[in-house]
A protein has these predicted regions:
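SDR active-site strand-loop-helix element
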Residues: 13, 42-46, 81-87, 117-119
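Short alpha-helix in the Rossmann-fold core of NAD(P)-dependent oxidoreductases
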Residues: 47, 62-69, 82, 100-101, ...
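NAD(P)-dependent short-chain dehydrogenase/reductase
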Residues: 96-98, 102, 106-158, 162
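NAD(P)H-binding glycine-rich loop region in Rossmannoid oxidoreductase-like domains
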Residues: 27, 31-64, 88-91
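N-terminal Rossmann/SDR dinucleotide-binding element
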Residues: 1-41
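C-terminal substrate-binding subdomain of Rossmann-fold SDR/epimerase-dehydratase oxidoreductases
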Residues: 1, 142-243
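Conserved Rossmann-fold NAD(P)-dependent oxidoreductase catalytic core, especially the SDR/UDP-sugar
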Residues: 70-98, 115
Length: 243
């Protein structure tokens, strides 16, 4: 948001504190709040994420991911909408989260000016609770898996989104990752490996050829992040502050 506000007028609607306007709380959400303003561009990153959590709350994931997105598409049919999809959408039958992302992509196809950004496994210095890497850093992880994941740092992800903003002719869906999957077990070889983890993809790897053609080049690696070679000195690209 800070990078966008340097040259644009930005309106944010979010559950988090910090917005100057259109902050919403737990008593209202994007299904009920007023959508009166018009925009040149909408970046829709809202929704519920998390594969395992979705198994316990499929209705909540459908409501927050599918119904909210459909409302935005219908309300702004002529506005360019970049929305957060997921690599999970490649196998929608595995879990409710993947299914919700796939259905959003299907709904978006009815509108000619939408782009689903298929984020792969995003990490940063301030992840949501329960994320694999945070548990690993906090020594709370009990086991690893045989999965391979394409980890992408939040700063690289933001660079990708900004590139897509500048390329309005790109529609449909597009992968945003590094193109280099990492074996989960290799990140913590001292921990036991669990083989059977239902509802999860065995392998994810972003095809970033389209993004590379637009000038996208990931800068960060998860291995260096975990060894603190970069983690302690990552500079906030938005305002020059260490985060």
């Amino acid at each position: 948001v800070k990078r966008l506000t340097k040259e644009n007028s930005v309106v944010g609607i979010d559950l988090q504190d910090g917005w100057d306007r259109d902050h919403i709380d737990n008593t209202q959400d994007l299904l009920t709040c007023e959508l009166n303003e018009e925009f040149d561009l909408i970046i829709h990153l809202a929704g519920k994420s998390g594969v395992r959590e979705s198994i316990n709350d499929p209705a909540g994931y459908w409501r927050n991911n599918v119904e909210v997105s459909k409302r935005l598409f219908a309300r702004y049919p002529d506005t360019r909408v970049l929305y957060a999809s997921s690599s999970s959408a490649y196998e929608p039958d595995l879990n409710p989260y993947a299914a919700s992302k796939y259905v959003v992509e299907e709904a978006a196809e009815r509108y000619c000016n939408t782009l689903g950004m298929r984020f792969h496994t995003v990490y940063s210095d301030n992840p949501r609770k329960g994320m694999f890497l945070q548990k690993l850093i906090d020594n709370e992880l009990e086991y690893t898996t045989t999965h391979y994941r394409d980890f992408i740092h939040l700063f690289d992800l933001i660079d990708g989104i900004l590139i897509l903003i500048e390329n309005p002719r790109i529609t449909g869906t597009i992968d945003i990752g590094t193109g280099h999957p990492v074996k989960i077990a290799n990140l913590a070889p001292e921990l036991p490996v669990r083989i059977n983890t239902p509802g999860e993809r065995e392998w994810t790897c972003a095809n970033i050829e389209k993004m590379k053609a637009l000038g996208f080049k990931p800068k960060y690696t998860v291995e260096k992040f975990l060894t603190n070679q970069e983690n302690d000195n990552i500079i906030n690209l938005f305002n020059g502050e260490t985060i």
